[in-house]
């Protein structure tokens, strides 16, 4: 069977169509939300799975008016198993300033001459061009200097709260959480994604955890829509910036 090669025009047309697919969703309308049924949170809630360790059932105290279970009034309401929900508090207020200044200089000189050596320099001087002499045969001077200066100044402030779902419980008891939030304002959709690993004992009694107690934390705050499209360079310009060496 013979394989047909695509022409350059066909390839260019295909690339143009593919580059427009990401924006076709919000062409002339507001961007669509991501379906909840496709999220890992939905899967974790739908299939909580079996516990890794089976705990023996505690006997019921008939003399007490309160139940000791998680769903009771005095029970522990914190997230602890797959499918449970907790609140992630993100309060980032960071400021960093770095300044470096480097100066380096070096100089050296070397000279070599043979004014007297058994009369040989005088014999050689007669054969050399006018002005040349063995008394100052070699002289080398060198110098180098370099300097550098750099500074970094950044400031970030972000305050958010998002509900996350326990998507997995590791064998050591650590909880793997994932949370997402979408907010659409006019023709712009803001997206907040958070994921990481937390210890059950770090979760507060209010079923909340701060971002600085999340291991391998991944926090993404961005969006998609008409404003984001205008802020980004065109795909052709991005390709040229990557390919052109000047």
From Swiss-Prot:
An example Gene Ontology biological process:
bacterial-type flagellum-dependent cell motility
Q: Does the keyword Lipoprotein apply?
A: yes
The UniProt record lists lipidation (S-diacylglycerol cysteine) at 21
| A Gene Ontology cellular-component term | bacterial-type flagellum basal body, distal rod, L ring
For this UniProt entry, the molecular function terms from Gene Ontology, in alphabetical order, are: cytoskeletal motor activity
Can you locate the N-palmitoyl cysteine lipid attachment residues? 21
Q: What Pfam families does this protein's entry cite?
A: FlgH (PF02107)
Subunit structure comment from the entry: The basal body constitutes a major portion of the flagellar organelle and consists of four rings (L,P,S, and M) mounted on a central rod.
PANTHER family cross-referenced by the UniProt entry: FLAGELLAR L-RING PROTEIN (PTHR34933:SF1)
This chain belongs to the protein called Flagellar L-ring protein
Q: What is the native source organism of this protein?
A: Ruegeria pomeroyi (strain ATCC 700808 / DSM 15171 / DSS-3)
Its gene name is flgH
């Amino acid at each position: 069977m013979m394989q047909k090669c695509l022409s350059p025009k066909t390839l260019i047309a295909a690339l143009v169509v593919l580059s427009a697919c990401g924006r076709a969703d919000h062409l002339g309308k507001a961007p669509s939300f991501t379906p909840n049924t496709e999220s890992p949170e939905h899967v974790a809630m739908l299939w909580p799975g079996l516990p890794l360790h089976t705990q023996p059932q505690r006997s019921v105290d008939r003399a007490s008016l309160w139940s000791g279970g998680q769903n009771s009034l005095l029970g522990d309401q914190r997230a602890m198993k797959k499918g449970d929900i907790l609140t992630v508090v993100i309060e980032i207020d960071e400021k960093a300033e770095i300044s470096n200044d480097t100066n380096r200089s070096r100089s050296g000189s070397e000279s070599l001459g043979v004014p007297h050596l058994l009369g040989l320099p005088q014999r050689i001087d007669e054969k050399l061009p006018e002005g040349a002499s063995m008394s100052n045969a070699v002289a080398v001077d060198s110098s180098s200097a370099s300097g550098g200066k750099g500074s970094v100044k950044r400031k970030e402030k972000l305050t958010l709260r998002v509900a996350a779902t326990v998507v997995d419980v590791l064998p050591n008891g650590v909880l793997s959480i994932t949370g997402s939030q979408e907010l659409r304002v006019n023709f712009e959709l803001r997206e907040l994604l958070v994921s990481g690993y937390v210890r059950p004992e770090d979760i507060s009694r209010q079923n909340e955890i701060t971002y600085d107690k999340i291991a391998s934390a991944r926090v993404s705050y961005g969006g998609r829509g008409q404003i984001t499209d205008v802020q980004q360079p065109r795909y052709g310009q991005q390709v040229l910036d990557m390919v052109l060496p000047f």
